[in-house]
Every structure is written in C-alpha cells, then in structure tokens.
Amino acid sequence: MSPLLLDEMFSGIIAGQLRAKGHHVLAAVAGPALVGLADDQILAHATAARRALVTANVKDFIPLDARYRAASQAHAGLILVSAKTFPQDRTFTAAVISALSALLDQPSQIQPGQVLFLPRG
C-alpha cells in the first residue's frame, strides 16, 4: 500500500475515511505548514515524505512532472483526479474515497515517478 498526501483541493474528510479503512493518507489541509504551498513545494514535500501526491490540478502538475523528468529526478508519484471523471457535485467526496480505496487495496505500489489518472471505482 502506498502512502498518499492529498493536496489542499481535497477535504480532510477524504483522508480520514481512507485512514479508517487502514490506508496511510494525510491531507494537506490538516497541516498548517502545507496549506498555501506552491505546487512545486507541495510535490517536493510529498516526495521527501515518500508519499504519492493526489491532486485535481492536472494542468499545473503535468508540467511539474515534465520538469522532474527533464532533471532526471523522480517524485514519489502523482495521482491525478480529472474533473471529467470526478465532477464536482454531491457525489465527489464519496466517489474519490471509493476510487482511492480501490487503488490502495491493489497489491501493486505506486512507483516513484509514476503518473496515473485515478479511475472511477
């Protein structure tokens, strides 16, 4: 099971529900030092903590991933949550919890440098 850091676009409720299922998940909103960090800083923090970063900010994190690759560096992994797959409606929180839980229940680990779009669970 891969440990995760949810960026500040996600509620601490999601992290709490996933922790209740036995997953190692932290939410940036729960740590005052993480709130308001620039995208490159939150990715660096997640990488230093060996946690894959979960974000819905696809347009900014794809270029950050490219910068890591160009520098021959690997982040701890990126899980991208597409608004097309997970619309921001009343089902969003439950759908993200379900999809992340299904992903984390798989025996394979998220690899350093890996980027994946979260599939709907």
Region annotations inferred by a language model:
Residues 1-8, 12-20, 34, 43, ...:
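Acidic, PIN/NYN-like endoribonuclease modules and their adjacent C-terminal/linker elements
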Residues 22-31:
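Short, basic, glycine/proline-bearing loop/turn elements
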Residues 1, 24-25, 49:
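Short, surface-exposed connector motifs at secondary-structure boundaries
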Residues 29, 57, 82:
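Short beta->alpha connector loops at strand-helix junctions that form conserved
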